[in-house]
Amino acid sequence: AAAVVALNQTTGDEVWRSLTDRGQYSSPVLVKQNGADVLICWTGDGVAGLNPKTGTPYWQHPFKPTRMPIGVATPVVHGNKIFLTSFYDGAMMLEMSETSMDVKQLWHLIGPNERKTEGLHSIISTPIWIGDYLYGVDSYGELRCLRASDGKRIWEDLSAVERQRWATIHFVANGSNTWMLNEQGELMIGKLTQAGLEGTSRETILTPDQMRTPNRKGGVVWSHPAFANRCVFLRNDRELICIDL
């Protein structure tokens, strides 16, 4: 067993396997560190920077879950910084060394539980990094702005998505605007700044899927939108739609 496996994209043959960590849902990210390609993988036990050709770890940093491996968000890389957010285990900022193949922790904020949170306790949504600030959705739908240098909360907005456990917004940057699809199927266009969520237009474009849970009677849209050729592509469990923008 292995947490990460590389396959030949033409034949599907296995090229290498790496790490004995538990797996989870987060996608790997390919970045540069000191001129070398590094595959950043957030596993069920920590974060690793791998040589993408061989799978050999350049570095590893622990981020063990207090309950279960449940990370879905993709690691957010900005320069030599790596930001991670977990529903139960809060937010962590790492820094990749610019002189060696190493990494160090800058800060880690975690609240006492999923309702009393510090930093950002996100489950599905990948945050977005703009300038010196991070924006993401906390455990019960709180849209938050954090100062990237130390994780301090700058503001919180409760209007972007309904207050529910695991509430989700997908963020896509487009120039000075951010396009946001919330789990009610509403597409929002606005500006995320340290002053707040500004100038938001909002329209329901996809019907949420029903879930067999008491707190989700209205359903959810958890699939990420895709943007291409001035169109947005969206899906639920019943249909795939394309909307001209």
Outline where the language-model segments fall:
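Noncatalytic, solvent-exposed loop/strand surfaces
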Residues: 1-245
